[in-house]
Amino acid sequence: MTDILKSIALYKRREIAQAKVRMPFETLERKAHDHDPPRGFVKAIEAKHAVNQLALIAEMKKASPSKGLIRADFDPPALARAYEEGGAACLSVLTDGPSFQGDLSFLEAARAATHLPCLRKDFLFDPYQVYEARANGADCVLIIMACVDDEEAGQLTRAAHDLAMDILVEVHDEAELTRALRLETRLVGVNNRDLRTFETSLELTERLAEKIPSDRIAVSESGIASHQDCLRLKAHGVSTFLVGESLMRQKDVAAATKDLLIGKLPPLHGKHAHGL
């Protein structure tokens, strides 16, 4: 585990302990099971693939440890609607406060504004957080293999299955991929960001994609900024992408989302430019 992940793990475990005092697990468990049923996260991605479209998990990220504030006018419902209008399959909502200025309330607000399924994007260590995610509207949770051992990953997986939630398991290298493939989860995400340097390289997805079995859905995360990037990865069999920062920096998020998925349309000339 890198130094930054160690520091994150320390404060997350403190947060979990404090949350358990505020709301005992039995209460949280009831709240999670009483929430309206999960929207199918994997199904939404498969629906895009079924009509030969790229599937985008569009992320709401207000800030990050490496880039600081990314979007000042951060309005989760408005952003969710813009992403849906632009053609996203699913939403990813940062709920970590100290590092990303996220909040659990963003999750429920985004989900209520659209029909799209939502991922709770956070650092999960304890099944309590999975129930917390479902109680706040999440349809899918993230398991970062760099953060947890195999026993913890298994506990998180079982909690998600208990709640009929989907799981995105995230890897950064081949060793983590080998561990991830032992879990019962359809979505395998390759994070192109080096957690030591914070630099991104799409070559990581290109290299690992061929090692992901065809019964899993490969997801490329981080460093994707254009339709050309998507096409480059599609050539390696990857048609699902998680994109946040490059879209969060755009004034017109809906238009930017559409451009990412289908490319910019060429300007009209001659009679077509005037509707003739």
Swiss-Prot record:
Pathway recorded for this protein: Amino-acid biosynthesis; L-tryptophan biosynthesis; L-tryptophan from chorismate: step 4/5
GO MF annotation: an example: phosphoribosylanthranilate isomerase activity
Organism for this UniProt entry: Methylocella silvestris (strain DSM 15510 / CIP 108128 / LMG 27833 / NCIMB 13906 / BL2)
Protein name, entry field: Indole-3-glycerol phosphate synthase
Family, similarity comment: Belongs to the TrpC family.
Gene from which the chain derives: trpC
Keywords: Amino-acid biosynthesis, Aromatic amino acid biosynthesis, Decarboxylase, Lyase, Tryptophan biosynthesis
Entry's Gene Ontology BP terms: L-tryptophan biosynthetic process
SUPFAM superfamilies per the UniProt record, alphabetical: Ribulose-phoshate binding barrel
Catalysis: reaction(s): 1-(2-carboxyphenylamino)-1-deoxy-D-ribulose 5-phosphate + H(+) = (1S,2R)-1-C-(indol-3-yl)glycerol 3-phosphate + CO2 + H2O
EC number per UniProt: 4.1.1.48
Enzyme class at the top of the EC tree: lyase
